[in-house]
């Protein structure tokens, strides 16, 4: 590991909050441009209670990297809470004093991160960059 670099998994944690009482109605997706975008899914007749809630200040990413134009779909929510498909992984920075979430999003926005995520993806038909691989990312964490 490079000097000054830290393992990301020491700073983040999974979040799995479901929309059980249907309190959140804003449905979004995550684009390869690393932003939350309005969902284009047809949700007529869909049970939204199993969708995941993303709270302001949390991240979401799509672990499937196949056919994403060599990019990973990951975004930081800096607006009101939303719901996303349960196929996304939601996580947050445990201690914002140790790692600024906006700094982390800058790191995720680098082309080097996309290349790393694609390289570390596994699978034959559906390549996956899973939670364990994300946690092993090494990045410089400023003091």
PLM segments and residue spans:
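Non-catalytic DNA-recognition/assembly elements of restriction-modification systems
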Residues: 1-19, 140-143
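Sequence-specific dsDNA recognition surfaces
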Residues: 9-59
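A short beta-sheet element
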Residues: 56, 60-111, 131
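Short amphipathic beta-strand starts and helix->beta connectors
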Residues: 75, 120-123
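A short glycine-rich beta-alpha junction/loop motif
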Residues: 82-87, 122-143
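Periplasmic-binding protein-like
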Residues: 113-116
């Amino acid at each position: 590991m490079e000097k000054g670099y830290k393992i990301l998994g020491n700073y983040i944690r999974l979040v799995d909050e479901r929309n059980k009482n249907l309190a959140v109605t804003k449905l979004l997706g995550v684009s390869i441009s690393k932003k939350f975008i309005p969902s284009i899914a047809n949700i007529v007749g869909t049970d939204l209670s199993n969708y995941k809630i993303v709270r302001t200040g949390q991240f979401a990413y799509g672990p499937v990297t196949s056919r994403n134009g060599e990019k990973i779909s990951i975004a930081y929510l800096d607006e009101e809470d939303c719901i996303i498909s349960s196929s996304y992984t939601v996580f947050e920075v445990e201690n914002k004093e140790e790692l600024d979430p906006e700094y982390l999003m800058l790191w995720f926005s680098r082309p080097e991160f996309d290349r790393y995520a694609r390289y570390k993806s596994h699978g034959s038909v559906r390549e996956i960059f899973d939670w364990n691989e994300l946690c092993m990312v090494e990045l410089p964490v400023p003091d």
